[in-house]
């Protein structure tokens, strides 16, 4: 008998066919249980903000400056300076952010983990992170990878002569890949067929003639710009594994005008307007080069597929030396300016100073070179001082010249370099800080003093706060005002549940529920909301006017307090006397401090906690519920207890009775779970789409309850049913109320970073 046949172990723990393999559409609750203490080596007592505040910030910056020009033989610096590589590293860390769901961005250092560490657009960034490992190693816990990556990009810009707008730390690392982010459904790198569906494919490359020449481009339409090309939400990249657009053009077609359409769509989904987009491209491409020294088949597997001996690196290149002048990254071989490690306006000067014709890189990728051999010898070689080149451009670069709106901005920046410098500094700061949330999270000596609208500013509290006696008195007035428990609870939920743990936006602080656009969202029942707010504002005015010591209560605080009063009253109705924890300190933002367009992305397309869905979607209602719970940073038990409690408190949008499995509404009982688990009823679908159901008494056939998919999933899904059985047990009443209050308080305080 052979040695192999004696061994009974063919697979390690966790291998084999999984539940997901058997049931691909099974509801995924794992996204609610990420980033726990079980995966965090720092321990639960670790306080990153405290550690960062003790950092010798200037010493870190000096160490990074030293790294910039200390070229390493194992990965030589282009032009003797790593600055452009580090700018790309920071850009690609932050540039995954998208407004639709707040996911992506630099805030958690996810570039270290799959899939981002192995995206085709991130080739060679594995080396960039290794180059700064000595700095990370030196300062250890005092600076996270997430902060260091962004800071390195800032220092790189400064070391190349650019004045940045500022830098703020405060991005604690996570220690595992984020499984909750939807990056697309394609199963091949650079695939785009799923995100564009069955839409018309781009035409094949033309003969290298620009779609629109300078003298008449405003009147000539791209052969593809008019075609239907709608990117799937919430994605903000045109192909799987790219940050934004294909630099060769849509689907590799070198059409600058069509490329502009993709650029506008993807950068817009990253919260950038046209001016910010032009500034980022023109500013970023003032530096460095792209790499396409040879055919892509010389490049080995990405980090996640590479062998153990590669130690987390990937894309080993067998072309020539595999590095330096033989580097293959994107397959494009473009250097934009003659001073690629020094800030200048030459990118725009070259863009408009030459006429361009299509050519190919040594790797066979579409790129552009000046016509008639113009510009020859203007550009230095990255590694061989004896060689010179002509400037070159990407299809996506030419979009800034041949798209009418981009061209107007680009020419203004060309003629006013100081405007480009200011716009790039501000856009770079926004790019690298967009997912950090409120200013309370910003740390460090270089945090800008200027208040920026995209930061969702909230005024500082400049008055004394209410004390326990005031809180009790205010709750009494609220409960005596005639407002019902559902009105109080639903209003507080509407305010707080806008929070997104992804980009730390939303929440009750700021009192923006009373402002556009939130006051007009259908999910918030505008007519009812207006009446509730009018009553609460009256209570606020009366209280504030009666104070002689400067004590005040904000409407933001009062909305949350009113919800707490409603929960306490509902618990009292069930025979439980509880006090919902309340911490004052919220402030009221103004309409002028609120970007209506930006806040529109926080409007929920579905809120299962209020049994609301705006439309019909491919994604199941229960999956949308889990997605909402994940954005609220809830665990599966917290999601369950909140939904079960909110159902019996009767806060459904439109006063729908779906899921209100109780004869005692406005009473905080565990009736939702008890009646859902009742075997005396039989559930049947009442719609062809299987999205509404009714429960009929097995003996009489009478309809007893109605519900939606988000209600029935708590009895259908095995894991959720197990949780429901805990809360539906006869001895669970007290635990249910206690857990509901804890989960409610968590949601009310999700945006209170000032309490951390």
Curated annotation (Swiss-Prot):
Binds 1 heme b (iron(II)-protoporphyrin IX) group per dimer. The record marks 88 as: Transition state stabilizer. Its cofactor is heme b. Heme b binds at residue 285. The keyword Zinc does not apply. Formation of the three residue Trp-Tyr-Met cross-link is important for the catalase, but not the peroxidase activity of the enzyme. It is an enzyme of class 1 (oxidoreductase). This is Catalase-peroxidase. Keywords: Heme, Hydrogen peroxide, Iron, Metal-binding, Oxidoreductase, Peroxidase. GO terms for molecular function: catalase activity; heme binding; metal ion binding. Homodimer or homotetramer. Residues 214-223 have a biased composition (Basic and acidic residues). The lineage of its organism: Bacteria, Pseudomonadati, Pseudomonadota, Gammaproteobacteria, Pseudomonadales. One of its GO terms (cellular component) is cytosol. Its EC number is 1.11.1.21. It comes from the Bacteria. Pfam families: peroxidase (PF00141). It comes from Pseudomonas savastanoi pv. phaseolicola (strain 1448A / Race 6) (Pseudomonas syringae pv. phaseolicola (strain 1448A / Race 6)). The keyword Heme applies. Residues 198-230, 371-390 are annotated as: Disordered. There is a cross-link at residues 91-244 (Tryptophyl-tyrosyl-methioninium (Trp-Tyr) (with M-270)). GO terms for biological process: cellular response to hydrogen peroxide; hydrogen peroxide catabolic process. Bifunctional enzyme with both catalase and broad-spectrum peroxidase activity.
């Amino acid at each position: 008998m052979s040695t192999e046949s004696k061994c009974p172990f063919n697979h390690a723990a966790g291998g084999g066919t999984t539940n997901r393999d058997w049931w691909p559409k099974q509801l995924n609750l794992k996204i609610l249980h990420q980033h726990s203490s079980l995966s965090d080596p720092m321990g639960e007592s670790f306080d990153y903000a405290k550690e960062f505040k003790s950092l010798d910030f200037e010493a870190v910056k000096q160490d990074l400056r030293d790294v910039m020009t200390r070229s390493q033989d194992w990965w030589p610096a282009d032009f003797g300076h790593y600055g452009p590589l580090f700018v790309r590293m920071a850009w690609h860390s932050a540039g995954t952010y998208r407004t639709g769901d707040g996911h992506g961005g630099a805030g958690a250092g996810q570039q270290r983990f799959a899939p981002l560490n192995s995206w085709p657009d991130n080739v060679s960034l594995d080396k960039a992170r290794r180059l700064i490992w000595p700095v990370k190693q030196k300062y250890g816990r005092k600076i996270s990878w997430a902060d260091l990556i962004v800071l390195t990009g800032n220092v790189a810009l400064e070391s190349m002569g650019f004045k940045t707008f500022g830098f703020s730390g405060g991005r604690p690392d996570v220690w595992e890949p984020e499984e909750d982010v939807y990056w697309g459904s394609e199963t091949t790198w650079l695939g785009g067929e799923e995100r564009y569906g069955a839409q018309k494919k781009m035409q094949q490359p033309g003969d290298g003639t620009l779609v629109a020449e300078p003298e008449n481009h405003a009147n000539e339409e791209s052969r593809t710009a008019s075609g239907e090309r709608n990117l799937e939400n919430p994605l903000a990249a045109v192909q799987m594994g790219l940050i934004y657009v294909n630099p060769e053009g849509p689907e590799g077609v070198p059409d600058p005008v069509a490329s502009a359409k993709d650029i506008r769509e993807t950068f817009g989904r990253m919260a950038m307007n046209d001016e910010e987009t032009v500034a980022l491209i023109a500013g970023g491409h003032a530096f460095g080069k792209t790499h396409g020294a040879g055919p892509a088949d010389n490049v080995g597997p990405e980090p996640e597929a590479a062998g153990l001996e590669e130690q987390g690196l990937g894309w080993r290149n067998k072309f020539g030396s595999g590095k330096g002048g033989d580097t293959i990254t994107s397959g494009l071989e473009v250097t934009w300016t003659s001073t690629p490690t020094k800030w200048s306006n030459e990118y725009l000067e070259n863009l408009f100073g030459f006429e361009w014709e299509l050519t190919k890189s040594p790797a066979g990728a579409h790129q552009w070179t000046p016509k008639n051999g113009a510009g020859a010898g203007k550009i230095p070689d990255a590694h061989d001082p004896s060689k010179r080149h002509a400037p070159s451009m990407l299809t996506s670069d030419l979009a800034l010249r041949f798209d009418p709106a981009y061209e107007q901005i680009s020419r203004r920046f060309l003629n006013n370099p100081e405007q480009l410098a200011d716009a790039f500094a501000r856009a770079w700061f926004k790019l690298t800080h967009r997912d950090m949330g409120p200013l309370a999270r910003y740390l460090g000596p270089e945090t800008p003093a200027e208040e920026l609208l995209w930061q969702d500013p909230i005024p500082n509290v400049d008055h004394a706060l209410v004390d326990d006696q005031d809180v009790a008195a205010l709750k009494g007035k609220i409960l005596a005002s005639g407002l019902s428990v559902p009105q109080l609870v639903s209003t507080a939920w509407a305010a707080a549940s806008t929070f997104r743990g992804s980009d730390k936006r939303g929440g009750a602080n700021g009192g923006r529920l009373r402002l556009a656009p939130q006051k007009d969202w259908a999910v918030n029942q505008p007519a009812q909301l207006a009446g509730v707010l009018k009553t609460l504002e009256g209570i606020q005015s009366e209280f504030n006017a009666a104070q002689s010591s400067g004590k005040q209560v904000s409407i933001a605080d009062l909305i949350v307090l009113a919800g707490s009063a409603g929960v306490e009253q509902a618990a009292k109705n069930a025979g439980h006397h509880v006090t919902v924890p309340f911490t004052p300190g919220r402030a009221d933002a103004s309409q002028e401090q609120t970007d209506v367009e930006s806040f529109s992305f926080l409007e929920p397309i579905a809120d299962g906690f209020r049994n609301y869905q705006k439309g019909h979607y491919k994604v199941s209602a229960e999956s949308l519920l889990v997605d909402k719970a994940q954005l609220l940073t809830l665990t599966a038990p917290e999601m369950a207890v909140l939904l079960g409690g909110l159902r019996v408190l009767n806060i459904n949008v439109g006063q729908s009775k779906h899921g209100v499995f109780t004869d005692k509404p406005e009473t905080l009982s565990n009736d939702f779970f008890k009646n859902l688990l009742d075997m005396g009823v039989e559930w049947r679908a009442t719609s062809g789409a299987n999205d509404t159901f009714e429960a009929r008494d097995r003996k009489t056939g009478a309809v007893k309850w109605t519900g939606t998919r988000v209600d029935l999933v708590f009895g259908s899904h095995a894991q959720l049913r197990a949780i429901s059985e805990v809360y539906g047990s006869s001895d669970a009443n007290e635990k249910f109320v206690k857990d509901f209050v804890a989960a409610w308080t968590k949601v009310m305080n999700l945006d209170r970073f000032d309490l951390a």
